[in-house]
Every structure is written in structure tokens, then in C-alpha cells.
Swiss-Prot record:
GO terms for biological process: calcium import into the mitochondrion; cellular response to calcium ion; mitochondrial calcium ion homeostasis; positive regulation of neurotransmitter secretion. Heterodimer; disulfide-linked; heterodimerizes with MICU1. Component of the uniplex complex, composed of MCU, EMRE/SMDT1, MICU1 and MICU3 in a 4:4:1:1 stoichiometry. Belongs to the MICU1 family. MICU3 subfamily. This is Calcium uptake protein 3, mitochondrial. Changing D245A: In EF1(mut); abolished calcium-binding. Residues 1-43 form a transit peptide. Keywords: Calcium, Disulfide bond, Membrane, Metal-binding, Mitochondrion, Mitochondrion inner membrane, Repeat, Transit peptide. One of its GO terms (cellular component) is mitochondrial inner membrane.
Length: 530
């Protein structure tokens, strides 16, 4: 700082006083310490006044000098930071930040700072590491299901993203990952070694996903298919199997099963968020692993497909797809699709095995049971039951209920003595939710007759619609949760509307969205467009 002062303000020459009362000036213009008289002689009042004026003037000059130095240093620091972050502003046009037309003919200046380097676009069959900024950019063009899959996926192989079995369990039982996910890149050889530990379908159990943990992969279309399984009644299992079994031999082979890959892909394209085609191409590569041709069997049915669910799309279009150009391209699709845990589990390591209905039914039932067991155990703390309040909390997850405390207080005060909900009661209730549409028809009959439904009528309607018998304690607990007006009656508005949200956990999209990353990506896109 002293050296900087000398450069900015060189010390003035010391000139002799013009009169006997003018004080001498020292370095930097400060009055020199002198008595101008005999030692020990006190200054006169006039000398004291002149010295005080000179001292004040010197302090003002010093203060302004220090402020100037600080301002100059601050401006230089800001400029350095901006240069380090954004590089040389002359590299692009001032309007949009992109290269001008003349940039193609003129040689580029050498880089002058550590600006952000452009990230290369991923090509098919090429493994790249994608930064967090690119993840947020692609989220702008993804649907809610695609964003959730990418949020929980942890494996990347040749540009395509996969979930592990553990990732899938987290995606359907938690709101968001505990830590930010990073995609672990695997080679084809490493992936095949991982799939070698997949058990055959006849060795499946209700702990399959928990036993595999990180030793397996699930593609995006399989993720959608598994979500369908979680929300369908057992009666729908036979329908699903018959859709795949086009030749009627009571067996499904790998080619027949892979039809869902193309059906779900085309269904999803109807819901794509329009925008940058390059970004959409990168997103399709991540989700499906290859770019399929634009002409598709389902393209002519686009308007009708938009309003359908994935399950309806699969049910209505599987046979149509198999007897169209998809059947002719079955070998091409099989060669493009990367083997996954489900494909190896169903059809063996060589893909030659066939799947019968008994094994298919057992797999779907085991998956539903496994997810319910995980949710139940997360609240039971090793006990055989969960509290009625915890049961209410589980039912209200993934719903649009803003103030859940009202429902929880109903249980807390209406059931002061905790009896608990067993796993059998817990499982039977969620099996009932998978038959909610049939139950809603029965419940609407009471609404049309302007009748409220009581506990006995509710229990009978459940049995008629689903064949399930609820225990009196389970029925009473359900009424205490949803009977907000405390009239011991249940209405369509109090129950059916909320349970429809709960049934489609993760399938209709979660109400908790990452607002800040989406806003930041949108703002960045808007700034770059100007």
C-alpha cells in the first residue's frame, strides 16, 4: 500500500516558508514538525491555527486518495472475475453471444482466459460425461415422468440412461433422492457382467429388487411398464399377458415383449415438449438408446393417443403394432435394444427362453408386494404393525392435499388408543385401491341416490367390487381419516378424489418439482436467445 501511494502521489518538494508564520510542509504535504524558534518555546495562537488548518487539509487529501485506490482495486477485481467466467467477449456477436457471420472467415483469437469450453453433443453409441448445466437444460424439454426417471437414474451405458433396481425402489417410495445423483458410466462388457447375476424368472421372489440392489439396470420404457404394474388389479394381469401373446400359444417371447418398447416410445413422443431438436435428440438417446425412424405404426392414431393412459395405449395397440411394420422390424428393434435385468430375468441370458402366465403373474404380484413391504417396514420400526397415524400419512403421500395436518389430527383424536394396522390389512387396502374404478361405480350409486355411505355399506361395497374383506378396525380407521366433517359418513369428494391421486404414485407426476433449477435453466435460455 505504501508503494502504491508513492506511485499515485509523489512527495512534493519542500519549499522554504514565505513568511515567518507559514509552516513548513513535510512529505505528502503534511506540516513538518518544527518550532521555528528556540527549543521549548511554545507556539503562538496564530501558529497553532495555521498548523490545524494544514493538518485538516492533509487528512482530506489522504482520505480521498484511499477511496480512489479502493474503487480502482474493486473495479479491477470485478473485471477479472467476469473475464474468468465468460472469457473474451469478442469471441461472439454482442447481440446473442454466438459467432457472427464474419467469424467463419476470420481467424479466431487465441483464448485469453479460462472461459467455459463448449460441451460436445453426444452421439449414439458414445459415452460422455454430462455436466449439471446440461442436465438442467434437457429438463426443460422433458415430461414429468422423464424428469423423474433422469433424477433417479444412476447408470449410463453408450449414451443411454438406466435405473438400478435400488433406484426404482427409491423412485416409487421417496419424494426425491437423498443426495444428488451422478451417472456412473459403464461399458457394454461391464454391463453384461452385471446382468450375469440376474436370476431366472422361476427363482423370483418378493425381495428380487432388494436382493439385486445396484446389480441390474432398468430402461425408461421398463420403468413405465413397472409403474403400470403397481397400479393394476390382479385381474388385469391376464389381460396384459394376453396382449403380448399374439399367437395364442400361452407363451411370450422376447420379440413380443419388446413391442412395449416401441409403443411406449411413440406414446411418449405425442407428449413431448416442443423445442430445440438437438436437445430433444439428446434426450431421446438418453431414454431409448437409439433414434428410431419417424414413420411409425402409431403415428396415424396420434390425436387419440394423447388422451389415453400408458396402460390403455398398450392394451389397444399391441395387436395393431404386431401386425404392422413393427413386426417386420422386430429383428432390428431387438438388435438396437440393450439387454436389461427384466429381459434377462424373463427370457434368459441368450434371449431364447419364453415366459408363461404363471411366472408372469408371480412377477407382477411379487413386485406389488415388495414395494408395499418396503413402505410398511419404513414405518413399522421392526414391529408387526404401524400406527393408525402412520397409515394416514402413507395414504396422503403423493396426493394434492395441501393441509394434511387436518386428516392426521382426525386420527389422533378419534383413535386415542393405538391398536395398529397389520401388513395384511395394509396390503389388502392397496389391493383395493388398484380396483378403485370398480368401487367408484358402486359408490356413485349411493351418491346418485343422495345417500351418504356408512361403515357397513362401505365394507359391503368393497367386497362386491373387489372380493376383499376389510377388518372392522381398518374400515373404522379409514373413516376417521377422511371424515373431515365428523358425521361418520363417507362421500365421493372426501375419499375417491384423494385416493385417485394416491393410486398413481409417480405415474401422473409428482407435485414436488424442482422449481429453482427449472427457473435457472429457463432464464439462461432466454438470455442466450437475446
Amino acid at each position: 500500500m505504501a508503494a502504491l501511494r508513492r506511485l499515485l502521489w509523489p512527495p512534493p518538494r519542500v519549499s522554504p516558508p514565505l513568511c515567518a508564520h507559514q509552516p513548513l510542509l513535510g512529505p505528502w504535504g503534511r506540516p513538518a514538525v518544527t518550532t521555528l524558534g528556540l527549543p521549548g518555546r511554545p507556539f503562538s495562537s496564530r501558529e497553532d491555527e495555521e498548523r490545524a488548518v494544514a493538518e485538516a487539509a492533509w487528512r482530506r487529501r489522504r482520505r480521498w486518495g484511499e477511496l480512489s485506490v479502493a474503487a480502482a482495486a474493486g473495479g479491477g477485481l470485478v473485471g477479472l472475475v467476469c473475464y474468468q467466467l465468460y472469457g473474451d467477449p469478442r469471441a461472439g456477436s454482442p447481440a446473442t453471444g454466438r459467432p457472427s457471420k464474419s467469424a467463419a472467415t476470420e481467424p479466431e483469437d487465441p483464448p485469453r482466459g479460462r472461459g467455459m469450453l463448449p460441451i460436445p453433443v453426444a452421439a449414439a453409441k458414445e459415452t460422455v460425461a454430462i455436466g449439471r448445466t446440461d442436465i438442467e437444460d434437457l429438463d426443460l424439454y422433458a415430461t414429468s415422468r422423464e424428469r423423474r426417471f433422469r433424477l433417479f437414474a444412476s447408470i449410463e451405458c453408450e449414451g443411454q440412461l438406466f435405473m438400478t433396481p435400488y433406484d426404482f425402489i427409491l423412485a416409487v417410495t421417496t419424494d426425491e433422492p437423498k443426495v444428488a445423483k451422478t451417472w456412473k458410466s459403464l461399458s457394454k462388457q461391464e454391463l453384461n457382467q452385471m446382468l450375469a447375476e440376474t436370476p431366472p424368472v422361476w427363482k423370483g421372489s418378493s425381495k428380487l429388487f432388494r436382493n439385486l440392489k445396484e446389480k441390474g439396470v432398468i430402461s425408461y420404457t421398463e420403468y413405465l411398464f413397472l409403474l403400470c404394474i403397481l397400479t393394476k388389479p390382479h385381474a388385469g394381469f391376464r389381460i396384459a399377458f394376453n396382449m403380448f401373446d399374439t399367437d395364442g400359444n400361452e407363451m411370450v417371447d422376447k420379440k413380443e415383449f419388446l413391442v412395449l418398447q416401441e409403443i411406449f416410445r411413440k406414446k411418449n413422443e405425442k407428449r413431448e415438449i416442443k423445442g430445440d431438436e438437438e436437445k430433444r435428440a439428446m434426450l431421446r438417446l438418453q431414454l431409448y438408446g437409439y433414434h428410431s425412424p419417424t414413420n411409425s405404426v402409431l403415428k396415424t392414431d396420434a390425436e387419440e393417443l394423447v388422451s389415453r393412459s400408458y396402460w390403455d395405449t398398450l392394451r389397444r395397440n399391441t395387436s395393431q403394432a404386431l401386425f404392422s411394420d413393427l413386426a417386420e422390424r422386430a429383428d432390428d428393434i431387438t438388435s438396437l435394444v440393450t439387454d436389461t435385468t427384466l429381459l434377462v430375468h424373463f427370457f434368459g441370458k441368450k434371449g431364447k427362453a419364453e415366459l408363461n402366465f404363471e411366472d408372469f403373474y408371480r412377477f407382477m404380484d411379487n413386485l406389488q408386494t415388495e414395494v408395499l413391504e418396503i413402505e410398511f417396514l419404513s414405518y413399522s420400526n421392526g414391529m408387526n404393525t404401524i400406527s393408525e397415524e402412520d397409515f394416514a400419512h402413507i395414504l396422503l403421500r403423493y396426493t394434492n392435499v395441501e393441509n394434511t395436518s387436518v386428516f392426521l389430527e382426525n386420527v389422533r383424536y378419534s383413535i386415542p388408543e393405538e391398536k395398529g394396522i397389520t401388513f395384511d390389512e395394509f396390503r389388502s387396502f392397496f389391493q383395493f385401491l388398484n380396483n378403485l374404478e370398480d368401487f367408484a361405480i358402486a359408490l356413485n350409486m349411493y351418491n346418485f341416490a343422495s345417500r351418504s355411505i356408512g361403515q357397513d355399506e362401505f365394507k359391503r361395497a368393497v367386497y362386491v367390487a373387489t372380493g376383499l374383506k376389510f377388518s372392522p378396525h381398518l374400515v373404522n380407521t379409514v373413516f376417521k381419516i377422511f371424515d373431515v366433517d365428523k358425521d361418520d359418513q363417507l362421500s365421493y369428494k372426501e375419499f375417491i378424489g384423494i385416493m385417485k391421486d394416491r393410486l398413481h404414485r409417480g405415474f401422473r407426476g409428482y407435485k414436488t418439482v424442482q422449481k429453482y433449477p427449472t427457473f435457472k435453466s429457463c432464464l439462461k435460455k432466454e438470455l442466450h436467445s437475446r
